[in-house]
């Protein structure tokens, strides 16, 4: 690039002229353009459409740098584009996250996750919202199971565990597909699971109530699957029920019930 050659030393790259007369004005112009475009686009389109638009624009800028610009320009240009396309609209994106969760918009969730992961602290509000969403989903599932009467004495252990596992499996898949198993989302998910399994409409204020129902279900599985040929399948089922998502000491609990079937009246 001729703008970057030092006339006194052709082998030495000097970018002062390039930066002053091209790079800086180019980045300023790009920021101005995207500031106006993003505001107009959001005024006329949905947030989910904007996620696609921002994704496309960032990809185009990456391609432009690779094709036509000095590699030193990349970080400066992309960071400014991320600021104007994502950071400037982060509040709106965060505020739309819950509706995407409620409607199971997996692709849009992944797109929002990917975009917000590009800015500092962009994911933390999403993690908090996801944790609250998982807890509410499980609490609602158990409340529906118990019904309006609120009688927990006759609660079927299998139905209780199935309700927990259904919520767990659904949101576990969301963590791994939409959020790519990101550690912060995994931590939020684990925290939500530990809280809802110990505090819900079936347990009241006693976490022992939940472990008792799960123990009854484990005992039912043991009695139903007593054949040696089914031992591996049984251990898999029990391991899923008492996974570390639910119990910090699940390995010890699992070995205990496998070694000595519970006698639960």
Give the positions of each predicted feature.
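Eukaryotic scaffold/interaction segments
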Residues: 1-265
